[in-house]
Amino acid sequence: MAKYTEEQLFAIKEETSYVPQPQILSAFNELIEQVKEHAHQQQLQYQQQQQQQQGFSGIGSGVSGPGAQKWRNGDTYIDEHGHERSYHHMNRRRPSRSNNGEKKPFFNKKKTEVVVDEDGWETFTPVQHAHRGSIGEDGSEEKSKFRDSVSGSSGSGAGAGAGAGAASGSAGGVRARPNNKNLGSSKQVDPRQIASTKQTRTFNAFEALEGNDDEDDDE
């Protein structure tokens, strides 16, 4: 970066000082006056057009006075009675269906609970939803009840099977069958949706036919 002394800066200032020229300044002032006059003429012409348009609409529709000023576009038509009317009522904008941008309050939303301990510390606890019973204390209680019921049913089925035989004992157990709608998804199965079905021995037609053949041979 170039460095200058004070004497050099004063010399440069004298050399590059601006000297206004009177002919250029007068031409510039005349141009400004012409622009102002042109803008004033345009404003007067616009006001005259607006007044003529309002008067034409007021006469054609039979409306005069302040009520005729609301029709400013000048687009009119002849109705079935021969009167000239404006299209103003056809250009009205429909009201918005989004409640004018205002969001409706969500009354069903539950607030978070605040727990204050002895030291004064506040802890926010999330609200547990009713349909999510597998989370929280209610879900743990339901799980424990379901396990107890399954274990009790399986124990009784095993005891009955020991007295009747190995085949009947295996058939007397309890098998947990999950809900079919959740098999193809990664969502965890809710214990309340699991149906416990007790196995029963099905009827075999081939075994029945073989038993009849043996009885016929004995006869």
From Swiss-Prot:
Gene Ontology terms describing biological process: negative regulation of translation
InterPro entries in UniProt: Caf20 (IPR031456)
Main location: cytoplasm
Compositional bias of kind Basic and acidic residues: 78-87, 100-114
Amino acid composition bias (Acidic residues), ranges on this chain: 210-219
Annotated Gene Ontology cellular component terms: cytoplasm
Source organism, top-level taxon: Eukaryota
Comp. bias (Gly residues): 154-172
Composition-biased stretches (Polar residues): 179-203
Cytoplasm in keyword set: yes
Name of the protein in its database record: Cap-associated protein CAF20
Keyword Ribosomal protein (UniProt): no
GO terms for MF: eukaryotic initiation factor 4E binding; translation initiation factor activity
Region (Disordered): 37-219
Functional description taken from the UniProt entry: Acts as an inhibitor of cap-dependent translation. Competes with eIF4G1 and EAP1 for binding to eIF4E and interferes with the formation of the eIF4F complex, inhibiting translation and stabilizing mRNA.
Similarity remark: Belongs to the CAF20 family.
Biased composition (Low complexity): 41-54
Coiled coil stretches, renumbered: none
